[in-house]
Every structure is written in structure tokens, then in C-alpha cells.
Amino acid sequence: MSQIPSPNDPASTGAAPSSAAVPAGPSATPAPSPTAGFSLPGHRPPPSGKALAALAVGALGVVYGDIGTSPLYSLKECFGGPHGVRPTDANVLGVLSLVFWAMTFVVTFKYMSFVMRADNRGEGGILALMALVGKTETTRLGRRMLLMLGLFGAALLYGDGIITPAISVLGAVEGVAVAAPAMERAVVPATVVILVFLFLFQKQGTAKVGAVFGPVMLVWFATIAVLGVRGILHDPTILRALLPTHGLSFFARNGWHGFLVLGGVVLVITGGEALYADMGHFGKRPIRVAWLGLAMPALLLNYLGQGALLLHDPGAARNPFYLLAPEWALYPTIAIATAAAIVASQALISGAYSLTQQAIQLGYSPRVTIRHTSQREIGQIYLPEVNWMLGTACLALVLGFQTSSRLASAYGIAVTGTMIVTTLLFHRVMRDRWGWARWKAWPLTVLFLTVDAAFFLANVVKFRDGGWFPIAAAALVFTLMSTWKRGRDALALMLKDAGLPLDLFMADVARRKVQRVAGTAVFMTSNPGGVPPVLLHHLKHNKVLHERVVLVSILAHEIPFVNEPERVNARELGSGFFQVIAHYGFMETPDVPALLDSLPRRELAGPRLTIVPMETTYFLGRETLLANGPSTIPTWRKRLFIVMARNAQTASAFFGLPPNRVVEMGAQIQL
């Protein structure tokens, strides 16, 4: 496991990065290796029986919310969108054939059979995959390219997270216009109200209502399956669409126009990335069982049912999903669809929280407030800043685009762009992690990329129709993350140069016999081999040291979780000094007071390291950054980095330090 910088230097306002990955010089005292000896988490036996069924139902509520609500708008876009085709019998069979094979190839073959095998200690997703392949890259250019690729993929996921709640809830509420055309004007206001309540509810957490997400989606999939079977029974000839020849003849018959329809077909596989990203929550087997056992059959039946309806009534293309339902079941279907859309939205919102937490720990995002909303579930978190940004963007989309059909034009680019990034990173896994030969890895990569690129190109033509939004959102997020990374790296070098090797400092303390005062002083440092500048400033200005001085380093690693027995290394340095190095994965949030309180139980560094909270003072540095320094970073990036640093959550809050026990010392740094 390769070490990475900790999440923004703990000794700063939120600007300074960790320099732990930078050697402290040949004379530095060797710190315990943060990467040596780490073992894989204990492997649990694959779930079976009731446990497997429970996990599979849970996966329905989290993993399949996005792809599960696609029937609300997918075929409507294929036949009624700006690039849709006329719903003739041949076109209906052709589009349904493309739908079936897209689901089979992309979701079942690509993600289920291959991509989900590339896990980072059980975790999946763009950033986890980027961290996994980054360990094998030895060249600076190669690591930089992988970093840029992964960050852009993550940025696209944020665009996906903004669009999904808007399009899912809009698509569900639009059923009201089918049931009562006079109520069409109420669709947008009703959608806004639902989304406002959804984002306001986030601070309460999902611990209580999360248990019903799975059953809600179970009812949803059962409902769409029944509706689909009802449609198929009216015209079983739609089953001919399962033959790939209808898809091929569709392209031959419609040419370029037929190719553009892929921009609508791709909507049936939106959410495929969620299967991989949420792998750590449920495991591979429950996700596969839920897909093959219920989600895919239900979706396929519903799409075929909509197709059968279009064979019988081409005019139903204006909203084939709701027109598939009998009149008496329309309002119950709208209610179930709205509930499913809320569940799908919640899954994407929670995914954005998790992605941001990973980005912070991996050093690609400033610190933000992270609140744990459940004492039992470690992954249930709430990020207020992210929540309000997502909520504002979602409401703006609904008010700006007005209909799910218009939003569909914006949706595809984010999804297909992420798919391409995943394929490129997965190729590196096959070659570097699994050791596959070129002749074995390249054909699979080319096959995946051909399909991904076809979907992407079919969506690029929608740039003016709304495709610009996810690109703009991704470009903004990418700029912020890359700027933060570059700024942190530059600042890390400056802080390292301003520090002092630990062994030289310890020798100087022993020689000078500095006056000591009662109590414990804790200094946060990102470099285990060096002395933090704040300690040097404290000694220079105050001329005293506490009787116990603890140097704490928080090191983040490119794995999701660290085993508890390997969490902490501690040692006594002499002269009342102790060093504590704590290891965290990118899915974990450090709590320094709790960590120090646990040291006696861990039997590390002896009984002398017992921390008494009311006798302990935490010293942090607060740097004022200026943009007129020698760094080669462009001035506009320096200024952006400084703004981000000023608005980042304070180190004391992020690491859980008691505010009344924190002393901050200022310094000015020219970046």
C-alpha cells in the first residue's frame, strides 16, 4: 500500500497539506513505516440464505435506485426526444433490441463480470479504482495522468449526482399530467417541493428510514414487472426484440439518425456505475443476486411491455411508462414511482457525500463538515456544504429545464464519460495489478471502449440541448480538485523546508535543558520525520515546553479502511517526548482525542502516555497564505487555492479537538 498525503495539514487552517510522503532528509529519525506490515481485512464468508436475501433487498434500495427509475423516461426519450425515431414496428423492435443488449453487455458483462472484480480492499468507485492503480505506477508523468483521469471521472459523478434527483423526481411527478392533463402546470412546483423536503431532511440522517428503502424498491420492481407483463400479454410479438438482428437492422435502416438514438438508449444503463461504487456496502454477491434475480428481469419486462404498447398504439410515445398502467392504477403507480424516485435520489446524494469524504481523505478536496448520523452505521454521514450545493443545483435544473425529456439530454454525457474513465482505469488494473498480457487485456479494453465511445458520441451532439451542463459542472469540480491538489503539494514542500529533522531537535532539547511546565502538549504534524513549525514557534516565543509533548501524525492511505490492530504506532522519544502515528483509510474520519484516549488500552508507549483531557493543550498552526511567492503555480490557481483554504473547515473541528483546549499560532507563507 502506498502512502499518500494526509487530508490537508492538521497544523493549518485547512490549507497546508501533509508532507509525510516527502522524505525528511538523510538525517531524519526513521519513523515507523506507515505502509509496512499492513494486512488485508479478515475475509468474511460469502453471505447465504437469509443474510444474502437481506443484503440483496438492501442493495435494491441503494444500488439500483438510479437504474431502477430509468423506465420513467428512457423509451420516451428514444421515441419522443429531440433525436428520437418514429415508433414504427421495425423501430420499436430495433430500439428494444438495443435496450436489451445494452443492459446485458454494459451492466451484466462489463460491470458484473469484470469491473466489480477490481476492488480496493472491498471498495469500488472511481477514486478507489484510481488509488488502486496508482500504487503500481512508478513514473511521475504516469501518476499525474492517472490522477487527472480519475479526478475528471469523479467530477463527472458529481454532475450525475446533481441530475439524477432532478430527472427522477420530475419523471415520476409527470405522471400527474397523464392522469389529469389540466394539472400539467403543477408538475414543476410539486417537484420543487419534494426536492426541498428531501434536502432539508438530510441532516436527520437515513438511519430510521433507510430500512424501508429496500422494501420500497422491491415494491417498485414488482410493480413495473407486473405492468410489463400486462403489456407483453397484449402483444407477445415484442419478444422478437431479444434477437440482436433487430438492433443491427435498426442501424442499417436509420443510419446516422439511428446512431443518435443511442443517446436515449444509454438512459437504461444509467446507474451502472453505482453497482461498482456501492460494492463495499453490500458485497459483490448480493449485488449480483439482486440484479440477476429481480432488477434486470423487472426492468426488461417493463421495457418490453412499453414496446408492446407502442406496437399497438404509437401515440403512447409521449409517455409510454404511465400509459402502460390501467386507468384505475395510475395514481397508485404515480405514488410508488415518486417514492422510488426519492429513494434513487437519496442514494445519489449519499453517494456524493461518500465521494467527497474520499476526496478529502485522499487530499483532493478541502475539509468540509462531516457529521455522522448513525451510531451503528459508520458510512451514514451528512455533509452540510455538499448538501446545500447539490440542493441548489438540483432546484436550478428543475426550474431551468422544466421536463425530464429536456434533462435527459444533459444526463447521458455524465454517465458515458464516467464509463469511459472506468474502462481506462480498469485496463491498468488488468495489466498492472492482475498481470494480464497485452493480447488478453487489449481486446477486452477495445471492446468496452467501442461501446462506451458509441454511447458518448451519441450524447455529445446534445451539447446545446443541455449536454453542456454536466461538462461545465465536471470542469468546475475538476478545476477545484486539481487546484487543491497542486496547492497542497506546493505548500507541503514549503512546510517541510521550514521544519527541522526530529533527531536534531531532540538533541537540541536535551542539550539546552528547556524549562518545563505541568501538563501535556499535543502538536499535530503531517511529517513523522520532522518537527512541525508550530512547535518551533512555540519554543522560540514562549521559551518553555510541557512536561509531556506528543507529536501526532495522521496519515491517510489509499485503502478504504485500516485494521484496528494496525491503527496506531506509538513510541517514547525521550526527554518527555512521544510520537503517535495513526493510520486511516479514505473511508474513515479521524478523531484525535478519542485516539489519544485509547492509547493506554492499546498498551502503546507505556503508562506515561496517559492523556488527561483537562491537562492537555492542542497546538495548531494558522497560516496566512499570499499569492506572491516563488511557486510555479499560475497566479489564478494560487488565488483560487487561497480562497478554498480560507473556507475550508478548521483543523480543530475536522479532527474533533475540543475548542477550549486549542492554541493557534499564526505565520505568513508566500505561496
Curated annotation (Swiss-Prot):
Residues 10-37 have a biased composition (Low complexity). It holds the Pfam family K_trans. It catalyses: K(+)(in) + H(+)(in) = K(+)(out) + H(+)(out). It is found in: Cell inner membrane. One of its GO terms (cellular component) is plasma membrane. Its main location: membrane. The chain crosses the membrane at residues 52-72, 92-112, 147-167, 181-201, 209-229, 255-275, 291-311, 323-343, 381-401, 407-427, 441-461, 465-485. Keywords: Cell inner membrane, Cell membrane, Ion transport, Membrane, Potassium, Potassium transport, Symport, Transmembrane, Transmembrane helix, Transport. It comes from the Bacteria. InterPro entries: K+_transporter, K_trans_C, K_trans_N, Kup. Residues 1-43 are annotated as: Disordered. It is a multi-pass membrane protein. GO terms for molecular function: potassium ion transmembrane transporter activity; symporter activity. HAMAP family: Kup. Belongs to the HAK/KUP transporter (TC 2.A.72) family. Transport of potassium into the cell. Likely operates as a K(+):H(+) symporter. PANTHER family: LOW AFFINITY POTASSIUM TRANSPORT SYSTEM PROTEIN KUP, OSMOTIC STRESS POTASSIUM TRANSPORTER. This is Probable potassium transport system protein Kup. It comes from Anaeromyxobacter dehalogenans (strain 2CP-1 / ATCC BAA-258).
